[in-house]
């Protein structure tokens, strides 16, 4: 399991936060069940590297003590997009966690080959599982979808030990008819001759 080191932050002022960001560190907080929240700072590059690779669960070493943590929330600067804050939740072995996981679509839908348009619904879902079973992402095969078909949460193939906490009917992806096809169909319906009595 990947590991990064954090230092404890004694000051929690805006000036201290700005100083850390200039030094290439990201301020954050580490918390968990029966644990007092601890203000920490981590190396921005190390954290970004883990996040870019989709790793949300790793070890965090604080003052020589290592905890298994989950990245619960990331805050980015609204203009620059740089990381400005992170929340780490300490997780315990044997205790289930809930976490947002991205859904990655793969395959070229049959409906798109026939001229349809692939529309995305949910791009991530909340899952519940043990920390060691947490997937980086959930794959969804859309290759068999025809025009008018949709893939719902209930259709996702999940890894063992993982359960989705979302409405099973929520749409992940759907194939809609091309706009000109819909307009053509409407014109045909409206211009049909009326039956005479």
From Swiss-Prot:
Cysteines engaged in disulfide bonds, as pairs: none
UniProt GO cellular component terms: cytosolic large ribosomal subunit
GO MF annotations, alphabetized: 5S rRNA binding; structural constituent of ribosome
Keyword rRNA-binding: yes
Lineage: superkingdom: Bacteria
InterPro entries named among the record's database cross-references: Rbsml_bL25/Gln-tRNA_synth_N, Ribosomal_bL25/Gln-tRNA_synth, Ribosomal_bL25_b-dom, Ribosomal_bL25_C, Ribosomal_bL25_long, Ribosomal_L25_dom, Ribosomal_uL5_bac-type
Record GO biological process: translation
Gene3D superfamilies with a match to the protein in the record: Ribosomal protein L25, beta domain, Ribosomal Protein L25, Chain P
Protein keywords: Ribonucleoprotein, Ribosomal protein, RNA-binding, rRNA-binding
Function: This is one of the proteins that binds to the 5S RNA in the ribosome where it forms part of the central protuberance.
Similarity comment text for this entry: Belongs to the bacterial ribosomal protein bL25 family. CTC subfamily.
Complex and partners: Part of the 50S ribosomal subunit; part of the 5S rRNA/L5/L18/L25 subcomplex. Contacts the 5S rRNA. Binds to the 5S rRNA independently of L5 and L18.
NCBIfam families recorded: bL25_bact_ctc
Full protein name: Large ribosomal subunit protein bL25
The species this protein was found in: Carboxydothermus hydrogenoformans (strain ATCC BAA-161 / DSM 6008 / Z-2901)
Gene, per the UniProt record: rplY
């Amino acid at each position: 399991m990947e590991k990064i080191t954090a230092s404890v932050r004694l000051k929690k002022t805006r000036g201290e936060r700005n100083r850390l960001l200039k030094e290439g560190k990201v301020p954050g907080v580490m918390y968990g069940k029966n644990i007092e929240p601890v203000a920490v700072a981590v190396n921005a590059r190390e954290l970004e590297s883990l996040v870019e690779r989709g790793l949300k669960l790793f070890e965090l070493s604080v003052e020589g003590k290592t905890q298994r943590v989950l990245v619960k929330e990331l805050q980015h600067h609204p203009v620059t997009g740089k990381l400005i804050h992170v929340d780490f939740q300490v997780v315990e072995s044997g205790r289930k966690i809930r976490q947002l996981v991205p859904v990655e679509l793969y395959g070229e839908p049959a409906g798109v080959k026939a001229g349809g348009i692939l529309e995305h619904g949910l791009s991530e879902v909340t899952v519940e599982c043990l920390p060691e079973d947490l997937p980086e992402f959930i794959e969804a095969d859309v290759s068999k979808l025809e025009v008018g078909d949709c893939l719902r949460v209930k259709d996702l193939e999940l890894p063992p030990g993982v359960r989705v906490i979302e409405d099973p009917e929520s749409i992940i992806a759907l194939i809609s008819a091309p706009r000109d096809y819909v307009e053509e169909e409407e014109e045909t319906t409206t211009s049909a001759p009326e039956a005479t009595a």
